[in-house]
């Protein structure tokens, strides 16, 4: 199934004073509760109302965008054959300018082959949200792998050390705990919690 994803930025983000502005670098925001400190947020928006820019995103993905250093960063799974029933996917990280919506970089980190385990039709191959920590972008694509990039889209490391067969695909977003990235695995035969070292991507436990 082909879906169109649109990324839009509402006026509140661009009119917020730098004194109170805060990066939204993880899923559900800096406090983890989904609550924003921004005041007077618009409650209505449309094509010509309270929207500064909108761009059509490549591919599919349920991941939420994160905002760091005037960049909007999101993951995507782009089908190599969009109209085919089965296709290989390019798993990528994409960044846009918060102020203009201009594409800043697009980094492909994994290729999912046609033979990869299938997922639920309502899930995507790019569902976990990126995490930005100390100038690095950490992305997780479930059983397809995990990677670390710079804020310029340069690959620092990637790993497929944690392999498992998924049931419905992946949706769990990693969290940062000290010097590790922790995420859950809900596989057909394996259910566990994994920690990777932030510096190398090696499995800590």
Regions found by a protein language model. Give the residues of each.
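Noncatalytic, solvent-exposed loop/strand surfaces
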Residues: 18-205
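Positively charged n-region of N-terminal signal peptides that target proteins for export
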Residues: 1-5
């Amino acid at each position: 199934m082909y879906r169109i994803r649109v990324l839009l930025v509402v006026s509140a983000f661009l009119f917020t004073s730098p004194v109170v502005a805060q990066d939204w670098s993880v899923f559900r925001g800096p406090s983890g509760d989904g609550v924003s400190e921004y005041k007077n947020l618009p409650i209505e928006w449309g094509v010509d109302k309270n929207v500064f820019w909108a761009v059509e995103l490549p591919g599919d993905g349920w991941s939420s965008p994160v905002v760091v250093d005037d960049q909007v960063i999101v993951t995507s799974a782009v089908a190599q054959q969009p109209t085919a029933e089965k296709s290989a996917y390019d798993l990528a990280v994409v960044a846009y300018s918060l102020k203009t919506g201009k594409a800043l970089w697009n980094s492909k980190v994994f290729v999912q082959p046609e033979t990869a385990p299938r997922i639920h039709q309502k899930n995507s191959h790019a569902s976990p949200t990126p995490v930005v920590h100390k100038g690095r972008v950490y992305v997780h694509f479930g059983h397809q792998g995990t990677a670390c990039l710079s804020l310029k889209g340069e690959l620092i490391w990637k790993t497929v050390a944690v392999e498992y067969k998924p049931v419905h695909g992946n949706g769990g977003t990693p969290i940062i705990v000290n010097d590790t990235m922790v995420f859950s695995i809900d596989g057909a035969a394996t259910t566990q919690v994994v920690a990777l070292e932030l510096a190398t991507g090696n499995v800590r436990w």
